[in-house]
Amino acid sequence: MKAYAIVIKGNKLSEAAFETLTDSSKNVENDFLIDRFEAVTPDYVDDTMKEHSIRWNYPWVGKEQCLETGLRKNAYRTDNPKARIACALSHYLLWKRCAKINEPILVLEHDAMFTQKIDFDVNDSNMFIVGINNPLGATRLARDYYTTIMGNKQWIQLVPKIDHYDIPQGLAGNSAYIIKPAGANKMLELVKQHGLWPNDALMCRQLVPRLGVTKKFYTKVQGLRSTTSL
């Protein structure tokens, strides 16, 4: 399996986090190397959006009710909007790569770190996308998310329902997930249909069929300062 880590070139925090990530993968003896994927940076957001004919369609303040999806779009705390868009574009480009090579890939953000060796083949599951990250410290309502997963006997299960039906409910952050070509094509279709949202909002159970998580967690977040919120 190919694995890619999104790294902001020249950003000391991101570069150091990537080293921690790769070291952790070696320590758990994963059977793959992690390729560095240069993140889109705020300076290149406009050109990248234009090149791929993408429009941003998510509020910066307050909330909006999306009539097309029935979902409520709540603004994220974002001091630099283009940093938020750049993050989403980095994931978008990896979705395109997955669709192009037509095989599953592991997508990692620089702040992920491995705690367990990946010991399963995603092709043994019918899920399109599988999150492998421990939710504790990584997502809102993290304890509810964790408890719901632990209460389910399935080793790979659908993303848990932990909130109102109109709140996008996805993975425990997007710091670590395996995506199949079917999942990548679905994400690209959603961007074309609804515009680009924050990647962890668009990748939600309400819009993506077969969006799953593992009961055994293979990664956790390093607990670093956000490079998108600040």
Model-flagged regions — what are they?
Residues M1-L108, A112-L230:
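An acidic/histidine-cluster motif and surrounding catalytic segment
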